[in-house]
UniProtKB/Swiss-Prot annotation:
Keyword check for Transport: yes
Gene this chain is encoded by: cstA
Protein known as: Peptide transporter CstA
Transmembrane segment boundaries: 6-26, 62-82, 86-106, 132-152, 159-179, 191-211, 222-242, 254-274, 291-311, 328-348, 391-411, 414-434, 461-481, 488-508, 521-541, 557-577
A single Gene Ontology CC term: plasma membrane
Membrane topology: Multi-pass membrane protein
Lineage: Bacteria, Bacillati, Bacillota, Bacilli, Bacillales
GO BP term (any one): protein transport
Length: 598
């Protein structure tokens, strides 16, 4: 198998899915039209509710949802071979992820941009709403801490990356102010993009100066700086920092992966990985479990991810200029993210299997595999860094992309530059999700505490916004600084996909209520059935074999208890949903004819 074949086939499948299935969801299932104003127009306040250009909204939404998942998940899942990850990315994104994202965004916009917990409360009752809100707040907290940990390791004692990431903040604020004043999006984007690229390319020079010494930060310092930054990102108006920064960052994200696609076509690397490895039944050095259910837990973003529900019921529904913008912003962004995941998978499987496992295993474990490294010593020398035992996926992606880029004409001597650039690129990729995620956590906190003190529910009340933003940053910032998260990614994988199940539950309820044909509910029920069974089995497997197994390396009673709580919350929500569906099925008066409520 070669990489070009995979890329061409994948792009064709995703394009057809967008054109046909995306249109079907918009026209037949959701019956979307532009006759009624969106929440951004109806509730415009110049701060949170702001009608925004379609492509700016796309850039913000894509930047927010495309965090570590489509990068790290496929890298780790390569342990099973290239085929399981490829199939799950394509099938999961088209049938599950794109549907999930568009129905969640639609459900939130119908309720004037309310969070998913508020929508669940309105549609399924107060108990389901409370369980949804509790699940969302729990997941967003560990997600922000987990994503930030990846950034910490990417920027630790890396002044080039720290400068390149940090400079995007004042550039974004300048773009936001300029666009707000002139309305000239093309000029603002062009100038901002040029400054962004300048910041990236002068990074190597900066690291040799006094400023570089100042930006050579350890993890503790970064663990304080990141929540402080996120506080301002969550408290400031969307148009000033969040939207323009994510919009500009999306240029870099899409640009890098277009370059990677070009590199794949030029180099046309073969895929030395087999379709299936010997670890599909479990016992692998990267992931302990079998290919099912762990392929669907390890690869979340890129296929289907509950984290997207935070953005789809948080910032994005308050930005869309027209209802029809949902197709490119939600459905389209999910399919683009799927392609990102496929490119990450190619970058990993373009390496020799022995080199891949040497990077993603500890030296002690790798010695037990009976493999011999092939190109890794040469790559380590060119990059100037010992690559063995650098687990977690981020370094593997950087090595894989560097391997492809340096195979292009005239680029063979730039390995160290490409490696550092990709590490920085990954940090920017993740920081944009932290921006939006912290703001969504702010909305959730305001919803919760607003039940006790009503003014807190007002998103335009400055003291309430400051309080909620500070509390959100304090919660995940404490976890980040203390480092007491343990096996965060396995716990996140289960809880994240459980939240995706909740999003599909809400979507199925809305579809049953408004669709002309009740069978359209299958667009949500089919992916929901698979995901709910998968996530519950994965949670059971982890609790039984890892979290509550004293002999397992990841033994953690706390993680076991938290996993059980999450599964119980999911069960309560789906029971409430089934009761609601049964009522609507029997009583047609509970269903509505209008596609968009008044």
């Amino acid at each position: 198998m070669n990489a070009v074949t995979i890329v061409i086939a994948s792009m064709c499948i995703l394009a057809i899915a967008y054109r046909l299935y995306g249109t079907f969801m918009m026209v037949k299932v959701l019956k979307v039209n532009d006759d009624k104003p969106t929440p951004a127009h109806a509730l415009e306040d110049g701060k949170d509710y702001v009608p925004t250009n379609k492509w700016v909204s796309f850039g913000h939404h894509f930047a927010a949802i495309a965090a570590a998942g489509p990068l790290v998940g496929p890298i780790l899942a390569a342990q099973f071979g290239y085929l399981p990850g490829l199939l799950w990315l394509l099938i999961g994104a088209v049938i599950g992820g794109a549907v999930h994202d568009i129905v969640v965004l639609f459900a939130s916009m119908r309720k004037n941009g309310k969070s998913l917990s508020e929508v669940a409360k309105d549609e399924l009752g107060p108990v389901a709403g409370f369980c949804t809100g509790l699940s969302m707040l729990f997941i967003i907290t560990i997600t922000m801490a987990g994503l930030s940990m990846v950034v910490l390791h990417a920027l630790e004692r890396n002044p080039w990356g720290t400068f390149a990431v940090g400079i995007t903040i004042p550039i974004a604020m300048g773009v936001g102010l300029f666009y707000k004043k002139t309305g000239n999006l093309k000029l603002a984007s062009t100038v901002g993009f040029l400054f962004l690229m300048a910041g990236v390319f002068i990074g190597p020079w900066v690291q040799t100066t006094a400023l570089g010494d100042f930006l050579t930060l350890d993890t503790k310092t970064l663990a304080i700086a990141l929540p402080v930054y996120a506080f301002f990102a969550a408290a400031l108006p969307v148009w000033l920092l969040l939207a323009p920064r994510d919009y500009l960052s999306s240029f870099m994200k899409i640009g890098v992966f277009i370059a990677l696609i070009v590199g794949v076509f030029v180099v046309n690397p073969s895929i030395p990985f087999p379709a299936f490895t010997e670890f599909v039944k479990g016992g692998g050095p990267v992931l302990a479990g079998p290919v099912w259910p762990f392929i669907s837990i390890t690869i979340a973003c890129g296929a289907i991810s509950g984290f997207h529900a935070f953005v789809g019921s948080g910032t994005t529904p308050k930005m869309l200029n027209k209802w029809s913008d949902m197709k490119p912003v939600a459905f389209g962004a999910m399919l683009v993210e799927c392609l990102v995941g496929i490119m990450a998978l190619i970058a990993a499987t373009a390496l020799q299997p022995a080199d891949y496992f040497a990077i993603n295993s500890t030296p002690e474990v790798f010695r037990t595999l009976g493999m011999n490294v092939v190109h890794l010593p040469e790559l380590s020398g060119e990059i100037g860094l010992d690559l063995e035992g650098r687990t977690g996926g981020a370094v593997t992606l950087a090595v894989g992309m560097t391997y492809i880029f340096t195979g292009m004409p005239f680029f063979s001597h730039l390995a160290s530059y490409f490696f550092q650039f990709v590490i920085m690129f990954e940090a920017v990729f993740i920081l944009t999700a932290i921006d939006a995620g912290t703001r969504v956590a702010r909305y959730l906190i305001q919803d919760f505490f607003g039940e006790v003190y009503k003014p807190l529910k007002k998103t335009d009340w400055i003291p309430g916004s400051v309080f909620a933003s500070a509390l959100a940053c304090l919660m995940w910032g404490y976890l980040l600084y203390s480092g007491d998260i343990g096996s965060i990614w396995a716990l996140f994988g289960v809880s994240n996909q459980l939240m995706a199940s909740v999003g599909l539950i809400i979507g199925a309820t809305i579809v049953l209520k408004i669709a002309d044909k009740r069978r359209y509910i299958l667009t949500c029920l089919i992916p929901l059935a698979y995901l709910y069974v998968t996530v519950n089995y994965a949670g059971y497997w982890m609790v039984r074999n890892v979290y509550l197994n004293p002999e397992a390396a990841g033994y953690s009673v706390l993680n076991g208890v938290l996993s059980i709580i999450m599964l119980v919350l999911g069960f309560i929500i789906i029971v409430a949903a089934v009761k609601k569906w049964a009522q609507m099925w029997k009583d047609p008066s509970l269903r509505m004819e209008a596609s968009i409520p008044g």
